[in-house]
Amino acid sequence: DPTIRIDFIYTNQELFFDGDREQLNRVFLNLIKNSIESIQQKAEKVSDFNKNISIELNDFGSHISLIINDNGIGFNNLNNNIKEILNPYFTTKKDGTGLGLSIVNKIINDHNGNIEFIPKTDGAIIKIIFSK
């Protein structure tokens, strides 16, 4: 969707992280795809809003953080069951299998990381921390 603005926020220094490039690529693409789909779902109901995704990458020495922040439909429809989205076969999508986020979670755990889903009033924040 060319109307979605994606901002990358990062330092100019190189980041080094020992991990499986293909698996980590799958994680990042899946999460960004989910953000895009969330914004598209919101656009079906709300016609006039700025469609934004920001992706922030930080190196804190002992760990690396990746934060994906979007202004889509968010997690509000999950009530207090945000952790359920990591369960295999849990889906909120009409044609979803429910495997995407459970696979994402496994890959992150296999890389000594953890993922956090943070609801906000207008969208969602996904925060991943990888220990070095």
Place the predicted regions along the sequence by residue.
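Short conserved segment of the HATPase_c
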Residues: 75-88
